[in-house]
UniProtKB/Swiss-Prot annotation:
Biased composition (Low complexity): 47-62
Protein's UniProt keywords contain Glycoprotein: no
Gene that produces this protein: ZAT3
Record protein name field: Zinc finger protein ZAT3
Tissue: Expressed exclusively in pollen.
Annotated zinc fingers (C2H2-type), start-end: 77-99, 162-184, 222-244
Lineage: Eukaryota, Viridiplantae, Streptophyta, Embryophyta, Tracheophyta
Function summary: Mediates the regulation of male germ cell division by DUO1.
GO MF annotations in UniProt: DNA-binding transcription factor activity; zinc ion binding
Region (Disordered): 1-76
Amino acid sequence: MNNNHSYDDRSFHIPLHPSNTSNPNPNLQFALSSSYDHSPKKKRTKTVASSSSSSPKSASKPKYTKKPDPNAPKITRPCTECGRKFWSWKALFGHMRCHPERQWRGINPPPNYRVPTAASSKQLNQILPNWVSFMSEEDHEVASCLLMLSNGTPSSSSIERFECGGCKKVFGSHQALGGHRASHKNVKGCFAITNVTDDPMTVSTSSGHDHQGKILTFSGHHKCNICFRVFSSGQALGGHMRCHWEKEEEPMISGALDLNVPPTIQDLSTSDTSGCCLDLRLGL
């Protein structure tokens, strides 16, 4: 009996068409309907299509950077300082930074400003005759000398050389010759004579030795034959050679008498005895 009642009860009736049933939650139904109407796949296809369609347009329009053409016509007015013209006002404004000495800013000078212009050749021809009339004779002579110097061609100036009279070696200065003359300590009468040569490199780069072999020069260097030290000039070598000469001449100087120094007691005694001997010998 209970089982028959359960089958006859309409509350347990299952509908065959769920679409006809009303949804108890209207918000859920609106969300489901909106999700079915706007699918994310369609949005992706639209965005891809729009990007693909816009890409050839962007590729067809490359970025254009304008570069200044030096051969382009100058459309601006000239610079008030140097007179140069430019192809754009922006270039002219940038160029005005090269003139920081001007008294104003910008490209427009003050209304009372006058640009100093150089005098033309015609104006100079008109001014010079009037100026010449005020010149004195000395000014004329100085001006003529300056004109001769400016118009004259540079003459081939001869180089003065100094030759040693003993070994006929030629040097370019008095100092070098003086150092070389010191090497001729045993040669007397070594004097310098001026010799003018056209080739300045004939002697300065020569290498060899003099007739006594005292000084050896290799590629412009002077070598001492005693201690074999090398010097860059003959003057330096001559000053160095004096050290060896003073050492050699010391014993000779010690044995000689110096008249500027008073004699000692021992010297007086020897001189007296020597005088007596001389008198005795003369008497005999």
